[in-house]
């Protein structure tokens, strides 16, 4: 029986070994094995158990002399000894003996100059379906002569024993950059596999002069590209899905000398409160070949209830980018971005809905990675909680933040790109900015129409704020104008400015010019 070189990994005596099956074959296997259920749209639905999101505290990086000085060690990048990694890896390989395994050999990185080959070894057919749809799929020719650069082994039903294995829980995501391997066990949340690929790209690409980004990207009719950075829930997917523009991708990209390229060949979208009116592209992508995680489904009609968060608030669907009508299937733009947009949702109501940043401000707000979470009313907390995630992607960045910030500045300067901070959050009226207005502002930035406006300097944040944009009421553009109580406005400005300053203290490698570009406290 063909083993496709698994013995090189040390995986011997596996059951049946399947390689690069089609989505239809993988769905058949998953159903036969009881891994999931078929919905009325044809999508496969699985429940991932207690892990319905990334388990950030269970991720470890193997600390070896070859990588030690590269990694920004801390609460995100926790070290684990090589001996402990090897011991867990050996147990996982022993666990897989006698079990069927599913291999997907594919690629990350649409630009052939920077493509990395990944071998994913899955215990579950449903997870293999997911990664088949999320990564870039090889042609038959490429598969014949495939040599992986990195290997990821995912065995969700293998549980670690923290006292013996030195992990924090039964789940572990273990990255060995030197050995070019990742081992994932104890968690069935498929996003762990996708984000492990991303973490590898974030480690290797800067060494090749490519800036890796946690962003969405699209292209206009003239070939002009734009990138949208932002944390979860700020509008990356929604705002980059524009009928006037082609979608390059929704989550992970590289900025090279002459293009922006998608790392992936698929999308991983949130499903909560999904509707055909609100997000038709995503809604219509939930069909045969898509993998849905943790959405409540009627056992008889097999219809999804996207509003029910009983299984998870972070319910998701993975599907190939081909399922989106205006996707740019090459996964590349013909040129570098002319527009960079940082999305934030400010619950204090004091950041302008759109503002222009200079080079130092761009680095400051990029490194800060600000948004805010509004606490749930069930615990009676009404105060917004400022959230900072370095470079809009802290959990996935192995190198020091200053590396990524310097790359952003260099790429923006070289491309002559304009950088805008867009607040999709609240203003002084207590209402969230209407999506239609935000779209009009983003369009003005993408077309350059915004440059025709007069700009004023925000007194607290120092950013340049336009005084007029077509289709947006002028009073909404200046935050102070939306507040009746000016003293409350000043107090909120001060509070947010202090949060920024406090958070920025940890970035000791940033230049004094960048540190001075933040809000005035």
What feature does the model see in each segment?
Residues 1-144:
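N-terminal accessory targeting/assembly segments
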Residues 2-43, 50-51, 206, 214-231, ...:
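Glycine-rich, often acidic-flanked micro-motifs
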Residues 68-73, 176-181, 385-391:
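Gly-rich Lys/Arg/Thr-decorated short loops/hinges at beta-loop-alpha junctions or inter-strand turns
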Residues 155-204:
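Charged, amphipathic alpha-helical linker segments immediately N-terminal to NTP-binding catalytic cores
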Residues 236:
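Conserved lysine of the Walker
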Residues 239:
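Hydrophobic positions on the alpha1 helix immediately C-terminal to the Walker A/P-loop
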Residues 476, 481-521:
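Generic C-terminus detector
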């Amino acid at each position: 029986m063909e083993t496709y070189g698994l013995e090189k990994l040390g995986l011997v005596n596996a059951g049946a070994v399947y390689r690069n099956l089609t989505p239809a074959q993988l769905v058949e296997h998953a159903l036969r094995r009881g891994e999931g259920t078929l919905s009325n749209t044809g999508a496969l639905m699985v429940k991932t158990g207690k892990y319905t999101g990334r388990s950030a505290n269970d991720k470890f990086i193997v600390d070896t002399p070859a990588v030690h000085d590269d990694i920004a060690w801390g609460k995100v990048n926790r070290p684990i000894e090589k001996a402990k990694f090897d011991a867990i890896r050996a147990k996982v390989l022993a666990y897989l003996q006698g079990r069927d395994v599913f291999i997907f050999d594919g690629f990350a990185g649409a630009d052939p100059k920077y493509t990395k080959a990944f071998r994913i070894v899955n215990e579950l057919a449903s997870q293999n379906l997911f990664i088949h749809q999320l990564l870039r799929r090889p042609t038959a020719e490429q598969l014949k002569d495939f040599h992986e650069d990195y290997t990821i082994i995912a065995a969700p039903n293998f549980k670690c024993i923290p006292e013996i294995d030195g992990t924090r829980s039964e789940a572990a995501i273990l990255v060995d950059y030197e050995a070019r391997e990742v081992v994932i066990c104890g968690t069935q949340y498929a996003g762990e596999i996708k984000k492990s690929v991303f973490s590898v790209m974030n480690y290797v690409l800067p060494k090749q002069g490519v800036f890796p980004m946690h962003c969405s990207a699209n292209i206009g009719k003239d070939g002009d590209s734009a990138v949208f950075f932002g944390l979860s829930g700020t509008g990356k997917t929604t705002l980059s899905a524009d009928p006037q523009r082609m979608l390059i991708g929704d989550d992970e990209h590289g900025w090279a000398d002459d293009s922006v390229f998608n790392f992936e060949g698929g999308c991983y979208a949130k499903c909560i409160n999904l509707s055909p009116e609100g997000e038709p592209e995503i809604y219509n992508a939930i069909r045969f070949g898509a993998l849905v995680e943790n959405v409540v489904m009627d056992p008889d009609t097999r219809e999804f209830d996207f509003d029910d968060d009983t299984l998870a608030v972070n319910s998701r669907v993975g599907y190939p980018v081909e399922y989106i009508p205006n996707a740019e299937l090459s996964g590349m733009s013909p040129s570098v971005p002319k527009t960079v947009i940082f999305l934030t949702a400010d619950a204090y109501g004091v950041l302008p809905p759109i503002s222009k940043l200079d080079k130092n401000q761009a680095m400051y707000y990029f490194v800060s990675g600000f948004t805010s979470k509004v606490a749930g009313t069930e615990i009676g907390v009404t105060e917004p909680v400022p959230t900072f995630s370095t470079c809009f992607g802290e959990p996935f960045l192995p190198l020091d933040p200053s590396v990524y910030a310097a790359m952003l500045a260099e790429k923006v300067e070289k491309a002559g790109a304009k950088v805008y901070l867009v607040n999709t959050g609240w203003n002084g009226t207590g209402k969230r900015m209407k999506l239609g207005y935000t779209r009009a502002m983003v369009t003005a930035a993408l077309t350059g129409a915004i440059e025709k406006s007069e700009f004023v300097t925000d007194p607290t944040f120092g950013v340049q704020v336009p005084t007029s944009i077509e289709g947006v009421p002028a009073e909404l553009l200046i935050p102070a104008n939306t507040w009746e109580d000016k003293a409350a406005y000043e107090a909120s400005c001060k509070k947010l400015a202090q949060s920024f300053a406090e958070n920025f203290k940890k970035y000791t490698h940033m230049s004094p010019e960048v540190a001075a570009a933040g809000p005035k406290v």
